Amino acid sequence: MNDPLDSLSNDEFEIIETFDPETEDREDQWSIQQSIRIEPISIQMPNTLQSQRAPSPVGSKAPESLKDEDPDRTPEASIVETPLLTETLKEDRTPMSTPLASLVNSSQSPEFTLQNMSIVSESECSNNSSLVNVADVESTEIALRTSLLLVSELKSQLQAAKMSESTLLKSNSNHEIEENKKLSEKMEVMKNEFELKMQESAASVEKVIQEKDSAIEQLKVQLAQSQQVAELWKQGAEKNSNAQYSDSKTTIDRLLEENSKLRNLVDEEVARRLEESERRKLAEDQLKHARGGSVFDPPASFVASQLAERTTYSLNLEHELITLRKELEETKEALKKSVEESSNKDEIVSALHELAGPTGEHPHARFERAGDQQSEAEMSSTWSAGRLLELSRQIVHFISHQ
């Protein structure tokens, strides 16, 4: 790629430098392309040279002698073309002895003087060359020397800029390499720390998982034991509930039968009392007719005592009947409650929790204790039923004697 600064153009020459970035130790390759546009009027000659020669007619109209010799001459041909300059520019681009060759190898550049910078020697100025041609060549020579001086200065500036740029790039690259090295070391340290933390967290998580697994195993064992205990308790509860239900049903049936018997006895006693009162009334009427219409008048104290005794007896009998009915209802409620408790699943679950409690009591012992309590309750209910039956019998016996 060509650097835009490597291509310089002025009004006389176009100087091109080919740059290859892959080769640092290269020789500057300069090429001069012939693009001569000389206008000597615009060239400022040095004061010393202007005082030594006459004004050059280059750029003005050609002499009349030249016009007469070539009538077909174009306006561009007003610049006098000397054979010497033309042949010099048409030579092959080989190392020259002119100041252009000194730019290629700056270490061997001689001191610039008017003698060694001139491209026209004294021998080349023959009698055939006119003064006009010599002045034209000198003006061209001055312009060329000025351009070469500018090119050499630009070349030195360009080389200095390239050297400074390469130095800056090297320093920047070294700084970036150091920063990248520090950053990589820092990243390596962070990576090691992160790996260490990950290993520690993995170890802690593994430990927690093992603890939870052991706790789950213990819970499974406890659950299996609780299921076995619950099954045993359920079997015992079913047996006890069936036995209690059968016993309670038998007791209730017996009590109902006794109650029906007592009611029949009471009805019979009431009917007998009514029949006796009817017979007494009939006997009193018969006795009254037998005495000739006289009324039998028993003593009032006797009648009052008999009425008081009969009233007390009736009240006692009624009180006993009410008491028996209440006890019978209570027995029915107790039986109903025991049946409901035996069929309630929530009580089974609560019993399971009690069995798994911190008391440490063996399940069979708890079953035996529960069975003892249930047997005591059965005995209490049986004793109450027997007491009621005994009282009923006493009442019947008392009524029959009366």
Swiss-Prot record:
Expressed in oocytes, but not in spermatozoa. Transmembrane segments: none annotated. GO terms for biological process: autophagosome assembly; regulation of autophagy. Phosphorylation on Thr-74 by ikke-1 is required for allophagic function. It comes from Caenorhabditis elegans. It is found in: Cytoplasm. GO terms for cellular component: cytoplasm; endoplasmic reticulum; sarcomere; striated muscle dense body. Self-associates. Interacts (via N-terminus) with ikke-1; the interaction is direct. Interacts (via the LIR motif) with lgg-1. Interacts (via C-terminus) with ubiquitinated proteins. Disulfide bonds: none annotated. One of its GO terms (molecular function) is protein homodimerization activity. It comes from the Eukaryota. Residues 44-54, 372-381 have a biased composition (Polar residues). Residues 168-347 form a coiled coil. A motif (LIR) lies at residues 13-16. This is Allophagy receptor allo-1. The C-terminal region is required for localization to paternal organelles. The modification Phosphothreonine is found at residue 74.
